[in-house]
Amino acid sequence: MLRAALLGLAAVPVAACGPALVTTRPRLTHGVASGFPRTDGAVIWARSDRPAALIVETAATESFSDTRRFTGPLLTPDADGTGRIRLTGLPADSEVHYRVTLDADGALSEPATGVFRTAPATARDVRLIWSGDVAGQGFGINPDIGGMTVFRTMAERNPHFFIHSGDTVYADVPIPETLPLPDGRIWRNEISEAKSAVAQTLDQYRGQHAYNLTDANYRYFNAHVPQLVQWDDHEVINNWYPGEVLDNDKYTEKRVDILARHGHRAFHEWQPLEAREAVDGRVYQRVSYGPLLDVFLLDMRSYKDPNSPNRQQHGTILGARQAGWLINEMASSTAVWKVVANDLPLALVVPDGTTDFEAVANGDNGLPLGRETELAHILSQLKARKVRNVVWLTADVHYTAAHEYSPSRAAFTDFDPFWEFVSGPLNAGAGKESTLDGTFGPRADFVHAAPPGKQSPLDGYQHFGQIDIDGDSGDLTVTLCDAAGTALYTRTLARS
């Protein structure tokens, strides 16, 4: 587990520079972040307020007494001042302290520090956390409660990494200065220009991510916990699909493909990831974390077919290429556990309007139709190729749950039993329990969802999940937690 490391700015002697020099120094505007750890390093992200080179130094301790120096790209307005560098050549299974500085033609920023752990090369205990759905439904950074404190709580669990299951922002939901609650209380928000209206331009989409990182808890989390990040719909607009044309008076730009292009670019600029490391240069990829764990990040948004009653003979949510990739990569994995990060749930019914559905399930409890046919193919192939120890993790529905899937209860039976765990939201409106479609035989072993009138983060229905893999036995334990870190549910799965 990671030791706590202070995130802060180094003091600069006043005598070292006059006022004119101070104004020309670059500034790190939104902290630092790490992502996608490997055995020899990770991606380091930062943002500058002016053109400047990204400089990263690493050390084994926070004293930075023996450093390695990495020179990254020039951060420019073309990418909204953001940039990243993949660190390589570091020892496996090691705590790495890093210090980020900006260099603008010799004028140096004050540094910011962070810490991460490289992935192990041998079997050892592994802890990850996951969740999603950040600052939605008008619930933003509330100064009355100290901001988005759930991020501080998650950082204190000392995970090796965090899977962000999507809805990293709510680009389609403005954040007002105040929000009246059903019980008469008032939720107050810190506000920004970008969050005053729905996002339509590239700069407005960028501003969604910038807003979240004005929260000190989130910046602390970013500096202490590496992330694997995927997207869902609200990085663009609710329930979107490729080719959609909006009938929505809030938008002057009706072409969702244009909005998605802006949302995609802003997402990749502002998250600690390298787009070129994804299979298609977008999201989906396999991340190995030692011999006990492989994570398969999915993109269930870019290739899905239009929202519909979802009862056609064949449908797609991953697309043939991604589905084939998932099957082959899982079959070739030698890791004990294969964790699939699906940004949309497998059996929860997610309506889009009165007749259409936007996720996998169509609500008829029968044999696979529509997008269910693609999942059926994947599950049957995993069974045929004897892929064992599979766990699916998701968010999206704004509550937490444990779902056990079994062919003994299912309309479609050609698959091995497995578990899917749901978590979220993070400082967003809490959701009510959704209906489970019986096609793949799910059973809700646990649900913690908001009752009517209890959607505010003040009401306690915010969640994250935690997975611990025992380095000796290889067993996997799932713990579903509330925003205070209280364990609501625990389940241990034995390796096969």
Segments (PLM) and residue ranges:
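Metal-dependent phosphoester/phosphodiester hydrolase catalytic core
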Residues: 3-6, 18-496
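Hydrophobic helical h-region of N-terminal Sec-dependent signal peptides
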Residues: 7-11
